[in-house]
Amino acid sequence: MTKWKRANPNGTRDYLFEECTLIEEVEQKLRRTFLERGYEEIRTPTIEFYDVFAFQSRPIDEEKMYKFFDEKGRIIVLRPDMTIPLARVVGTQRCDTPLKVTYSGNVFRANESLAGKYNEIVQSGIEVIGIDNVRAEIECVISVIQSLQKLKVQSFTIEIGQVQLYKCIVKKLSIHEEEEKVLRTYIESKNYASLSNFIRDKKLDRCDETVKLLEKLPRLFGNLEVIEEAEKLASSNEMKMAITRVKEIYEAIEKLGYGSYISIDLGMIQHLDYYTGVIFKGYIYEIGEEIVSGGRYDELIGNFGEMLPAVGLAVQVNQIVKALQEQQEPYERKRIDIMIHYELNRLAEAERLRNLFQKDGKKVALSLFSNLNDTFQFARKNQIVTVVEAKSESLVEYVWKEKWVVQKEGETSCVTFKLR
């Protein structure tokens, strides 16, 4: 029964000290940026009913969910996604739209043990609900670019894709569900040879414009030239409209001066089936890890109430922290400036003195030791150069100068002591 008591479950880890501080700072900077842009905060439970994620299209594999039972025997899951619970809130609470919301929280997914992915991650994100025009996507992209800039993330790019275009191709070529799952992997992984074999085995006409577009899809990544190529092969108004939407977003973001942060990838297909239109993925060049994901999901909220158009983007906080650790100087947590050693009958005075120093921007802590020498040893070990002793009759300040030297003493009041 005690075999695993010293270990972490697969896909999880402990975060200590400086890394915890950095995670908190990233979350808060993201939150501040989103709130400044007019987003309102929503928080949902860490646990949800299984039924919340088990609607018809089953966007999240059942095997990836952590499941258990509540006191009534109902199936509960640790939330594997943030967008679906938000859709539940909006659909059931009948919120006024348009609505801009932001969130931050932990997401849990059971990945394969050797996949190199964490099963618990932190996501901060935004959703624009109730708007079906291109302004919603533009707002989301601008918000995320500005937030990454404020975090000083270097060399990132946000790719713009269009799952609607892919769905139009699949529908027109009458590709069945099981075949589509295989086809999707070929396109996403840009496996040109397997895609060519798929077209051959399906006996699809390579002279057909839609088949040409399908075969070219994994190669359609880059700038606006990609759009021009796709437009030439689009064989329906629906395809053309899907391509035009990507073009409008790209041009709008480029005009703002953010062109270096965006690119187009029409061969990008999100793994979550609830996306219905434009989709996004963000990467950092040096790391190659996904730091942003999202897209348009116009049919998701309808599973919980009124059908409402929506777009969202999630920022992977853990990956941002990893990038910052690699791109910047090693992060050092702020050291304690002053340690206050006190006798128990002087606790109130010690706490007042701590507050006074803190107002001056100092990081101050009360000693946990009853013996002054133990406080001195702790201070030296932790590179604290100032110790203040609150004795019964007076206050004494010690400073480390190859040894502990009395800097000042004699006052009984913390106010007059600090002013000296």
Curated annotation (Swiss-Prot):
UniProt keyword terms in alphabetical order: Amino-acid biosynthesis, Cytoplasm, Histidine biosynthesis
Keyword Nucleotidyltransferase: no
InterPro entries (alphabetical): aa-tRNA-synth_II, aa-tRNA-synth_II/BPL/LPL, HisRS-like_core, HisRS/HisZ, HisZ
Pfam families for the chain: tRNA-synt_His
UniProt cross-references to Gene3D superfamilies, sorted A to Z: Bira Bifunctional Protein, Domain 2
Protein localization: Cytoplasm
One Gene Ontology cellular component annotation held by this UniProt entry: cytoplasm
PROSITE patterns for this protein: AA_TRNA_LIGASE_II
Keyword Translocase annotated: no
Listed pathway(s): Amino-acid biosynthesis; L-histidine biosynthesis; L-histidine from 5-phospho-alpha-D-ribose 1-diphosphate: step 1/9
One example GO MF annotation: catalytic activity, acting on a protein
Predominant location category: cytoplasm
GO biological process: histidyl-tRNA aminoacylation; L-histidine biosynthetic process
NCBIfam families named among the record's database cross-references: hisZ_biosyn_reg (TIGR00443), PRK12292.1-6 (NF008938)
Family: Belongs to the class-II aminoacyl-tRNA synthetase family. HisZ subfamily.
Function per UniProt: Required for the first step of histidine biosynthesis. May allow the feedback regulation of ATP phosphoribosyltransferase activity by histidine.
Subunit structure: Heteromultimer composed of HisG and HisZ subunits.
PANTHER family in alphabetical order: ATP PHOSPHORIBOSYLTRANSFERASE REGULATORY SUBUNIT, HISTIDYL-TRNA SYNTHETASE
Miscellaneous: This function is generally fulfilled by the C-terminal part of HisG, which is missing in some bacteria such as this one.
Name of the protein described by the UniProt record: ATP phosphoribosyltransferase regulatory subunit
Source species: Bacillus cereus (strain AH820)
